[in-house]
Amino acid sequence: MKVCVIKTSSMGDIIHTLPALTDAQRAIPNLSIDWVVEENFAEIPHWHSAVKQIIPIALRRWRKSPFSAQTKNEWKSYRSLLQANQYDAVIDAQGLFKSAFFATRLANGIKHGYDRKSIREPIASLFYDKKYAISYQQHAVERIRQLFAQALSYPLQKEKGDYDIARHFISTDSIEPYVIFFHSTTRDEKHWPEHEWRNLIEKVTALSVQVRLPWGNEKEKTRAERLAVGLSHVVVLPKLSLHELAEQIANAKAVVSVDTGLAHLTAALDKPNITLYGATAPTLIGCYGQNQHYLTANSMGNITSDQVFSELNLLIK
């Protein structure tokens, strides 16, 4: 069976789709999946063995210069690649107008998606041939698993979903024990105060456990350097690709993170993780997987380093 999956962004949403692929692969012999995904995240679907081809889309970049020659040529190439195959099923796991209009409607095959009451943008359901009522009152991973099971006609198993990518990143080398702190995210209100990060780093390094600080842009690099200054057993990592970052996560003792896509990557790699949430409720969209822990408060500033260390110490002993 050849299936086209539409899930273009964001990092967390793409990662949330992986357990559904595992379900489908185990239920359907010879399953082959092509995946339409934003170019910045194209590396992630490659990690799953069910995915045979990536169809990159660049809506975020194209909309900045929609009438340029480059955009027109890239759109033509994208559309040609998307329409090169006849699919047994086209599944829009995004459920947005942009995914339905720019991807689902163009793909060849019976189009499956959420019904109008099951998605944030009901207009998207107009582009689907088959529509499914799937409750919002469950984690996003479970919604996607149910969508795939109904679209591809297999019984959904009761076990917790399996991302099935961690084994690709585990190292057999002897490594000094370390933890990773994902200290940066896109929205200011989701950041944890830097003095709390510093206090936590001091507590962890006192146990002879190294702390590694990744970053993705210059602002995040500067923050990492501020957190590390004057402290021993702290490493500001170099700029890493997603694959390299996944290797770092997979071989860590544990992770502490703010609300970021990299927290979901940590969950997908079956790594113990403490995610810090302020006003955001993690029940339906938080990290999904084994050994995932949350600390919540009405404001990030109300979560203390003592609270985090108490939880983390149990994970790194």
Feature-to-residue mapping (PLM):
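Catalytic machinery of carbohydrate-active enzymes
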Residues: 1-317
